[in-house]
Regions:
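Non-catalytic helical/linker scaffolds that mediate oligomerization, partner binding
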Residues: 1-470
Length: 470
């Protein structure tokens, strides 16, 4: 979300074009601005009758240049350029940085990338608070441009003071997900959970994979966090660019195996910031992410500041739909066997559904866990998830192939089946006499207690009679 889609009309158009989740990037803008955006999304989602998740994306400990007196400044190859932790007015030769630990983390020979690698400098020496560098790749530098140190394990905390305040705001504002930037290992989630526990509840945390250390610790990160974002922007700066496609595939594979949603982000349709149609390479990139098994594809500048925001969403939605329609069998099946009771039951339900020709796979879920386990299987049978929790309803918008519905809590399994009958028939999803496979926990109301599967004939629980031709 951003200036290009501020009006209620634009938000409505985004949803109509295919948006499932709105991202609030707290690297830019104030709380009032983001609260207004969140409120507009909630209002438009309610009017459309669709689940739309809200993702609050924390800036993270991004290392940046400080401000220049004037500028931007063009650096030429061979120029000496000093980055200092002193409070200085920036010039072409010397500028400050937001990261006070920079001199301690650098050594001669290290390369520093500025503005996503548009400018490259090499450390010549470290003198007190100054990191003296020589320009290797020339280009322009200006206020607050990001700094990357490939291969250097910078000693920054997982959460900056700004991130802590932003997290508290996001929780109170009603976010469905929090995205944590520059995750390095599983322990990075501890500070997030500590603040959530102070507030009194937790919401899912998405780990942004954009550092080499995160790639090295990918399995433990997937286990500790609630989802993954393949943040290819910084990842492609911090690592050799040729590694990024393989990292993307591994992230998706591990997240799917763990039944956790995975988002592929950055430059998906980048040319649509200024053009009304994407490049062929961008269209293919989107399709390949779908075939890799991603749950969601993310647009950034395309919709926040782009000239063709609505068109970008509609274009991406068409690419996704066509890829799934024509290439569904190319999506890799999971190679792992279920490790939990819930995993075994959802897998069995998908297999039985295929055998009996089920119209839908139906899950009753409080936490969304059984729906996510079903989604990772990529069954061609659509999934309906009935939940009494509005938060779960919104969050399941991120999971592949799930159609969530809010339903009242019931106390008995038979009541759940009646609910399924009533809602499937009323919504027109299924007709009397058709088969569905229902997955639930018995007794109802206990999160994570999936232990039952049944093949159900629609209408049986409400006294329906199938047409004779069936």
């Amino acid at each position: 979300m951003g200036p290009a889609v501020e009006s209620p009309e634009k938000v409505k158009e985004l949803i109509e074009a295919g948006m499932n989740m709105a991202r609030l990037n707290l690297s830019h803008g104030g709380y009032e601005e983001h609260q207004n955006r969140l409120d507009r999304v909630r209002e438009a989602a309610k009017a459309a009758g669709k689940p739309i998740a809200i993702l609050v994306d924390l800036q993270g400990p991004k290392i940046r240049l400080a401000r220049f007196v004037d500028g931007p400044h063009e650096l030429e190859r061979g120029d000496i350029f000093t980055i200092t932790t002193d409070e200085v007015e920036g010039t072409k030769d010397r500028v400050g940085t937001t990261y006070k630990g920079l001199p301690g983390d650098c050594k001669p020979g290290d390369r520093i990338l500025i503005d996503d690698g548009k400018v490259t400098v090499e450390v010549v020496e470290v003198k007190g608070n100054d990191v003296v560098t020589k320009v290797i790749q020339p280009g322009a530098v200006s206020n607050s441009k990001g700094i990357n140190l490939p291969g250097v394990a910078v000693s920054v905390p997982a959460l900056s003071e700004k991130d802590k305040e932003d997290l508290r705001w996001g929780m109170k504002a009603g976010a469905d997900f929090i995205a944590l930037s520059f995750v390095r290992n599983a322990a990075d989630i501890k500070d997030v959970h500590a603040i959530m526990d102070e507030i009194g509840f937790r919401i899912p945390v998405i780990a942004k994979i954009e550092k080499p250390q995160a790639v090295d610790n990918l399995e433990e990160i997937v286990a500790a966090f609630d989802g993954i974002m393949v943040a290819r922007g910084d990842l492609g700066v911090e690592m050799p660019i040729e590694e990024v496609p393989l990292v993307q595939k591994r992230c998706i594979e591990l997240a799917r195996e763990a039944a956790k949603p995975v988002i592929v982000a950055t430059q998906m349709l980048d040319s649509m910031i200024i053009n009304s149609s994407p490049t062929r390479a961008e269209a293919t990139d989107c399709a390949n992410a779908v075939l890799d098994g991603a749950d969601a594809l993310m647009l950034s500048g395309e919709t926040s500041v782009g000239a063709f925001a609505i068109e970008a969403v509609a274009t991406m939605a068409r690419i996704i739909a066509r890829t799934e329609e024509g290439g569904f069998e190319m999506i890799r099946t999971l190679r792992t066997t279920p490790k939990t009771k819930g995993g075994a039951i959802t897998r069995a339900a998908a297999e039985v559904g295929a055998i009996v020709g089920a119209k839908y796979l139906v899950t009753f879920t409080q936490s969304g866990d059984s729906a996510r386990r079903m989604a990772r299987l990529r069954s061609p049978i659509p999934i309906v998830a009935f939940t009494p929790e509005v938060g779960t309803y919104n969050r399941l918008a991120l999971s592949w192939g799930v159609e969530p519905e809010v339903t009242p809590m019931v106390k008995h399994t038979d009541e759940m089946v009646k609910q399924a009958d009533t809602l499937l028939i009323q919504s027109g999803r299924a007709h009397i006499g058709e088969n569905v496979v229902i997955v639930a926990g018995s007794p109802p109301g206990i999160p994570g207690s999936t232990n039952a599967m049944r093949v159900h004939v629609v209408g049986d629980a409400v006294g329906g009679v199938a047409p004779a031709y069936r």
